């Protein structure tokens, strides 16, 4: 836990104050069919009102996962704060087989002790399935809640939780000297801060695998350039500024390489930079356009978009050589693929019959499932645990962020009120 807080602390260097309207998750589909669970409001052990409603944050996290449906506090048969106070039969009567209880205790030094217990109400009724406590300052209370959520989620699903992750995205605001901003927020839209402001467009943010840096495209010099920015101190390193287009950066999972697309020789082609030496190697060539690289987990293969067959489709190529292999066959065109962290599937933008939606393709069976029904969907990015996808879509006259589970059942949006939001990128585990 202390290590996790140290990693996250690097982000605080860039925090001054939240100067912009934040995005917030609004669930649109899928909660009613999810597993019911009880998340009791955490008992506040101090005077006045608690600085954060920890139980509400944990409940929202579990609801946002699409796998749980926390019942309303008004429907709870009791509101215990410890496992010993839980009456299992009262909960199982409502079809609930697990309950989260907890407390928040203020300390004399100004910090807070957050504790929780996950209680089984059915199998081994009354037994504690998971428990923990964290001592944090006020500004880390939400992070402590997300940590509890991660532990509860993993215990109940066997899948690592991703509630302590963040998302990067580009916002185009209405007017001002610097209308283009690269921002980062918690996965749920809270704690938003600006990484970089620019008078010219910003595009395609991509996280380093340790979460300490973001690569992106900037047009501040009058032409496109690829840069890597360190979040802890704001330092910017330019990595590519060749003639014509420089775009679509993607860090390799092992953190040693950066893939991107350049059109310095005419057509767009894929290149890979060794981040240690700065050496650049060309991966694809020819007259077709090859772009939008996404790494497979082995850090040796790329999925990418190519129009070599006429319309854009997704291909796979080894960065050390060999013929590319076409991956996508369904739909009139497919592009903007993101490979899942385990390499078993990819999500992509699939166009067919005039519609443009996010689809999932199983890389073993080839089966394709359309996940979304929103309008002009773009730039999907998969959560590090592989359960959710964030993407951009058109709503009205603007662009907003949307969420969909990788099984297609849960859907939500993250509306913003101060501009168009595009190019979302989900962070690794932090």
UniProtKB/Swiss-Prot annotation:
GO terms for cellular component: periplasmic space. It comes from the Bacteria. This is Tol-Pal system protein TolB. The lineage of its organism: Bacteria, Pseudomonadati, Pseudomonadota, Gammaproteobacteria, Enterobacterales. Transmembrane segments: none annotated. Residues 1-21 form the signal peptide. The gene is tolB. The Tol-Pal system is composed of five core proteins: the inner membrane proteins TolA, TolQ and TolR, the periplasmic protein TolB and the outer membrane protein Pal. They form a network linking the inner and outer membranes and the peptidoglycan layer. Keywords: Cell cycle, Cell division, Periplasm, Signal.
């Amino acid at each position: 836990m202390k290590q996790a807080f140290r990693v996250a602390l690097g982000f605080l260097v860039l925090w001054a104050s939240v100067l912009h309207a934040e995005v917030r998750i609004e669930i649109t589909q899928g909660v009613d069919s999810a597993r019911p669970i009880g998340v009791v409001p955490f008992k506040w052990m101090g005077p006045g009102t608690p600085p954060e409603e920890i139980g509400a944050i944990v409940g929202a996290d579990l609801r946002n996962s699409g796998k749980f449906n926390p019942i309303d506090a008004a429907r709870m048969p009791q509101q215990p704060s410890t496992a010993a106070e839980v009456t299992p039969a009262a909960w199982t009567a409502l079809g609930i087989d697990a309950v989260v209880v907890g407390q928040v205790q203020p300390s004399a030094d100004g910090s807070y002790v957050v504790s929780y217990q996950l209680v089984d109400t059915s199998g081994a009724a009354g037994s504690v399935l998971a428990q923990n406590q964290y001592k944090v300052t006020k500004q880390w209370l939400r992070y402590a809640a997300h940590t509890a959520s991660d532990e509860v989620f993993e215990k109940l699903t066997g899948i690592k939780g991703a509630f302590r992750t963040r998302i990067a995205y580009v916002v185009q605001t209405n007017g001002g000297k610097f209308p283009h901003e690269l921002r980062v927020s918690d996965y749920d839209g809270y704690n938003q801060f600006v990484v970089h402001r620019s008078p010219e467009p910003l595009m395609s943010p991509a996280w380093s695998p340790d979460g300490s840096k973001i690569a992106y495209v900037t047009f501040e010099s009058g032409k496109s350039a690829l840069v890597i920015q360190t979040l802890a101190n704001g330092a910017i390193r330019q990595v590519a500024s060749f003639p014509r287009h420089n775009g679509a950066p993607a860090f390799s999972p092992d953190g040693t390489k950066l893939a991107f697309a350049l059109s310095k020789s005419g057509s767009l082609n894929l290149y890979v930079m060794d981040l240690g030496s700065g050496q650049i190697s060309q991966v694809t060539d020819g007259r077709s356009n090859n772009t939008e690289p996404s790494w497979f987990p082995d850090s040796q293969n790329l999925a990418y978009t190519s129009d070599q067959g006429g319309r854009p489709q997704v291909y796979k190529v080894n960065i050390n050589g060999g013929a590319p292999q076409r991956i996508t066959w369904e739909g009139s065109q497919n592009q903007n693929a993101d490979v899942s962290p385990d390499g078993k599937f990819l999500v992509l933008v699939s166009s067919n019959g005039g519609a443009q939606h996010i689809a999932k393709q199983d890389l073993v069976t080839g089966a394709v499932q359309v996940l979304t029904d929103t309008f002009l969907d773009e730039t999907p990015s998969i959560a590090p645990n592989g359960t959710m996808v964030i993407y951009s879509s058109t709503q009205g006259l603007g662009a907003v962020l949307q969420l969909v589970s990788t099984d297609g059942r849960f859907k939500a949006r993250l509306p913003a009120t101060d501009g168009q939001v595009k190019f979302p990128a989900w962070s690794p585990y932090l």
